[in-house]
C-alpha cells in the first residue's frame, strides 16, 4: 500500500495522508493545501 500512497491522498481515501495534504480543486486549477501537524513546541531558550 506504500506505493499507492500518492494516489490515495489525491483521492482522499487515506485519512492520515489527506489530513496532512489536501488537494483543493476549484474550476480548472488545483492547489495543495498543507495542514502542518506535529509538535508545536515553544521556542527553546
Curated annotation (Swiss-Prot):
One GO CC term on file: cytosol
Top-level taxon in the UniProt lineage: Bacteria
GO-annotated molecular function: ribosomal small subunit binding
Pfam families per record: SRA_like
GO biological process assignments: translation
Region of interest (Disordered), ranges: 21-45
Stated induction or repression of this protein's expression: Induced upon entry into stationary phase, this is controlled at least in part by the RpoS sigma factor.
Subcellular location(s) of the protein: Cytoplasm
Disruption phenotype: Not essential, a quadruple raiA-hpf-rmf-sra knockout strain is significantly outcompeted by wild-type after 4 days growth.
Quaternary context: Associates exclusively with the 30S subunit; there is 0.1 copy per ribosome in the exponential phase and 0.4 copies per ribosome in the stationary phase. This is also true for several other K12 derivatives and strain B/R.
Protein family: Belongs to the SRA family.
Function: Although this protein associates with the 30S subunit of the ribosome it is not considered to be a bona fide ribosomal protein.
Name of the featured protein: Stationary-phase-induced ribosome-associated protein
Naturally occurring in which organism (per UniProt): Escherichia coli (strain K12)
Lineage: Bacteria, Pseudomonadati, Pseudomonadota, Gammaproteobacteria, Enterobacterales
Amino acid at each position: 500500500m506504500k506505493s499507492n500512497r500518492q494516489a490515495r491522498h489525491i483521492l482522499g481515501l487515506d485519512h492520515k495522508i489527506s489530513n496532512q495534504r489536501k488537494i483543493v480543486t476549484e474550476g480548472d486549477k488545483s492547489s495543495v493545501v498543507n495542514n502542518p501537524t506535529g509538535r508545536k513546541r515553544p521556542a527553546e531558550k
